Amino acid sequence: MSTMKFCRECNNILYPKEDKEQKILLYACRNCDHQEVADNSCVYRNEVHHSVSERTQILTDVASDPTLPRTKAVRCSKCQHREAVFFQATARGEEGMTLFFVCCNPNCGHRWRE
């Protein structure tokens, strides 16, 4: 998918346009009325990449989520607090689900997995 398409007739930018009768995507020139059928139905793709610090913030916020299950059967290795929320998710580069724990001590937020 190229980022921009240009008119073959006048070299102006082609804009996405729907042909409602044929239900196809076209690229149309607003200057000379040239139109061409789009070779791909994807007009724009927005990829969001989160930094490590953003992912860490998401994990520390889960300790205050009232919808997540809590347990007092674990002890935080960092602060010795006896309450943690837990959830299952896939760990990066691993297959299957991993059980994650996040310490409920607001001054700690330590996270670990089993």
Swiss-Prot record:
GO cellular component: nucleolus; RNA polymerase II, core complex; RNA polymerase V complex
Deletion phenotype: No visible phenotype; due to the redundancy with NRPB9B. No effect on methylation at RdDM target sites. Nrpb9a and nrpb9b double mutants are embryo lethal.
Record Pfam families: Zn_ribbon_RPB9 (PF02150), Zn_ribbon_TFIIS (PF01096)
Compartment(s) of residence: Nucleus, Nucleolus
SUPFAM superfamilies per UniProt: Zinc beta-ribbon (SSF57783)
Sites where the protein binds Zn(2+) 2: 76, 79, 103, 108
GO molecular function: DNA-directed RNA polymerase activity; nucleic acid binding; zinc ion binding
Binding residue positions for Zn(2+) 1: 7, 10, 29, 32
Zn-finger region bounds: TFIIS-type: 72-113
Subunit structure: Component of the RNA polymerase II, IV and V complexes. Interacts with NRPD1.
Family: Belongs to the archaeal RpoM/eukaryotic RPA12/RPB9/RPC11 RNA polymerase family.
Protein name, per record: DNA-directed RNA polymerases II, IV and V subunit 9A
Organism this protein belongs to: Arabidopsis thaliana
Highest classification ranks of the organism: Eukaryota, Viridiplantae, Streptophyta, Embryophyta, Tracheophyta
